[in-house]
A protein has these predicted regions:
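Short, glycine/acidic-rich hinge or "gate" loops at secondary-structure transitions
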Residues: 134-141, 278-279, 434-440
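Surface-exposed, extracytoplasmic segments of Gram-negative outer-membrane nutrient-acquisition systems
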Residues: 32-50, 276-285, 290, 471-478
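Extracellular/periplasmic, surface-exposed regions of secreted and cell-surface proteins
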Residues: 103, 109-118, 124-128, 198, ...
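Residues embedded in well-ordered regular secondary structure
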Residues: 1-97, 136-138, 166-218, 223-236, ...
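Juxtamembrane/interface motifs at transmembrane-helix termini
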Residues: 140-142, 280-282, 344-346
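Acidic, Ser/Thr-rich peripheral helices and adjacent loops at domain boundaries
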Residues: 139-150, 469
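Transmembrane beta-barrel wall of Gram-negative outer-membrane proteins
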Residues: 59-133, 149, 154, 158-169, ...
Length: 478
């Protein structure tokens, strides 16, 4: 893949544009014009090298990307068993530097005849997806951090500033250290302040506009510094892993009667890390908290599912009559856990470790587990594949049900729901008197009545519980 860049103003064009905008500002004086240091192109201007550049911010943030796919598959078998083994690997680069993807997947399927009346189906699958992924695109909100997307910064960063420019600030404060990279503390935002009044003004921007009770964050970060300091498996990285095991032994007791048990295990695991480095940073003010520079976030989740379906099946055909009856017990066990953590102002990009020394730490998580089981029975009949009848009934209990439900019944201290169903069908087009046409070659009429339920209940809906919560990032309460 070859990237295409968007056309934006050059440094000279941007300077000319801002000069035109300055001419529209009322009450400009020679003294006020001197505050726009980028207008002065004379060699004696101390800031000339800072603002006399033609920087193409997109130039070194993209690359020609390549995608690779590899697959090996082996299959075979005999009258005893059949098997299929496949292994695949994919690696894909993004046209944006710092972002790529790779996937490893393995799968094994087999059907084995263990004994003369016992056969087993086995399916094992493993998949792992890994991502080096930089912040990309616009965020829905920047209430909690500055813009960290390199492709966005490559479009909106001022083109007359050099990516490597430093200059000494005689008015340095604790908030602005004199040796800090000053690429976007000026001329890189949307608004300015004049006498405490905000005005739209695309040329006089500061790192932070303080208008009394309102503070606006306008300074932009250096995208190249984010690329250089943001890559790594312990920084902007995500990984998902999935494991699936499915086994089904079947015992054919007679020609018409069989017993089977299907067991399934599934696990999904996810791990995400986000890192916005301190190098090349600008101060950012969080409402009611304070100033932040770097941002670090982690998220881990794990979901497992255990399922078992024990089934007895009887099926026979008597002339034009076909009967199938089966019933069994189904068990599901679900668990889901996650935890997250977020902190600010890590002072060393080489050690991206979340610790208690970071500012405004926020964390949380959950660990949920729920179970349900169902007894079910199904009987279906058809005559000449023309007339159909099907009756089904199931009884289900779940850990998310309350102890005193209005419907169903109580057994063994839990609530059970009963869900019957009756369905009838008639294939009209199979009748001797029905004449098919080009417009209709199959016509079936079905009717039925059933009672269904809903197990999509909130995990805590049937419980009374206490929960600790953080207040203003400093206090814990109930």
């Amino acid at each position: 893949l070859t990237p295409n860049k968007l056309d934006v103003l050059s440094g000279d064009q941007y300077t000319a544009y801002l000069s035109d905008m300055i001419s529209t500002v009322k009450n400009n004086t020679s003294s006020s014009l001197r505050s726009y240091t980028f207008l002065d192109k004379s060699p004696s201007n101390y800031y000339r090298k800072v603002f006399d550049n033609n920087t193409d911010w997109q130039k070194d943030m993209y690359r020609t990307a390549m995608t690779q796919n590899y697959k090996i598959s082996v299959e075979g078998g005999d009258e005893i068993g059949m098997y299929d083994l496949s292994l695949g690997y994919t690696k894909s680069e993004s046209t944006g530097k710092g972002t790529d993807f790779d996937r490893l997947n393995l799968r094994f399927n087999t059907d084995i005849k263990v004994f003369s009346k016992v056969n087993t189906e086995l399916d094992i699958a493993y998949s792992q997806n890994s991502y080096h992924i930089m912040d990309n695109g616009w965020s829905e909100s920047y209430d909690m951090q500055n813009i960290g997307s390199t492709n966005v910064l490559g479009l909106i960063q001022a083109p007359f500033i050099s990516p490597y420019a430093y200059y000494y600030d005689e008015n340095a404060t604790d908030a602005y250290s004199s040796d800090r990279l000053r690429l976007s503390h000026e001329y890189a935002g949307k608004y300015a302040a004049n006498g405490g009044t905000l005005m739209q003004n695309p040329f006089n921007f500061s790192n932070m506009i303080n208008t009394g009770s309102n503070i606006m964050n306008e300074a932009l970060r250096n995208p190249y510094w984010i690329l250089q300091n943001g890559e790594g498996n312990n920084k902007n990285y995500a990984q998902t892993t999935q494991i699936n095991l499915n086994v089904k032994p079947t015992y054919q007791v007679t020609k018409t009667f069989s017993i089977s048990d299907r067991f399934n295990f599934n696990m999904n695991r996810g791990n995400e890390k986000y890192f916005l480095p301190v190098s090349g940073t600008t101060n950012y003010y969080l409402q009611d908290l304070g100033y932040v520079t770097s941002v670090q976030k982690t998220f881990f989740s794990k979901a497992t599912t255990l399922q078992n379906d024990l089934r007895l099946n009887w099926e026979n055909t008597y002339g034009a009559h076909h009967v199938n009856v089966f019933g069994g017990w189904r068990y599901n066990n679900y668990s889901y856990s996650y935890n997250y953590m977020q902190g600010y102002n890590n002072e060393n990009d080489k050690l991206p470790i979340l610790s208690k020394n970071m500012k405004y730490i926020n964390y949380g998580g959950s660990n949920d587990n729920w179970i349900d089981m169902t007894y079910y029975f199904d009987a279906n009949y058809n005559y000449k594949n023309r007339y159909f009848a099907d009756f089904t009934v199931s009884s289900m209990a779940g850990s998310r049900f309350g102890d005193s439900t209005k419907d169903g019944f109580q057994l063994c201290g839990v609530s059970w729901g009963v869900f019957p169903s009756l369905q009838l069908g008639w294939v009209i087009s199979s009748e001797p008197w029905f004449k098919t046409s080009k417009g209709i070659n199959y016509l079936k009429l079905t009717a039925g009545v059933d009672q269904s339920g809903n197990d999509d209940l909130d995990y805590y809906a049937a419980r009374t519980y206490w929960e600790s919560v953080k207040v203003t990032h400093n206090t814990v309460g109930l």
